[in-house]
Amino acid sequence: MRKKYFADNQNFKTVELLEHLDDKKYVYLPLHFQPECSSCPLGGDYVHQDLMIDMLIKNLPEDWLVVVKKHVKAGGKDYALSRLRPNDKVILADNSIKSLDLVKQASAIATITGTAGFEGFLNHKPVFIFGSYFYMDAPNVFKVSDSRSLKHAINSVIDDFKPTTLQEVKAFLYACQLNTSRAWVDNRYRSHCGISDAENADTLSGLILEKFNKWNLLDAGR
């Protein structure tokens, strides 16, 4: 018996192999692990991830899908999906499919602040970002605040999209390098920075004081 491309799963269809999406136009939306600062506070209202999915359903053309992938650490029934009514435009990607492969094949990426959005930018894809994060001003990254801005972004992608050039990608990364500092605020990234705890503390405190001075917060409190 031929294996079905899509199997019913929690009121949504599931795709188990990437090639089953070969002829599909889709927006890839990997769900965030929650609770985490990547969606609260950085996502604002879109901490409720079902709002993102629902807006995409309502604004995408009829022949486009929303391919959703659960976070590998979420487990069980996902809260965002449990709040949605069943819809044929929403497809769940099996966890065996690599996220980066879904990014590379997607027509666009949607995320609150996720790594998939940055990967989409690096792979010259249009990105719909619903939160606030460092790459939100990158070329072909569309900041979404409401249904109107999402509709405008979708129309821009469909009507007049020009993939980001390698030169534009490099220019943005160089700008990030010029405007960031080597430090960490999460111990998971300590080993990647190559600086001591004392250097890290000095850098972070210096950056905080710089902001306070810029906004005259220190003088205001005297």
Model-found features: residue ranges?
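A nucleotide-sugar donor-handling region in carbohydrate enzymes
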Residues: 1-37
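A short, aliphatic-rich alpha-helical micro-motif
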Residues: 21, 85, 103-104
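Structural motif
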Residues: 25-26, 65, 107-108
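Short, solvent-exposed loop/turn segments at secondary-structure junctions
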Residues: 32-36, 72-75, 116-117, 134-135
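Mid-to-C-terminal functional-domain signal that highlights helix-capping/loop sites
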Residues: 36-50
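Catalytic donor nucleotide-activated moiety binding site of glycosyltransferases and closely related
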Residues: 53-93
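A donor-sugar binding/catalytic signature common to diverse glycosyltransferases
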Residues: 94-142
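Leloir-type glycosyltransferase catalytic cores
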Residues: 140-222
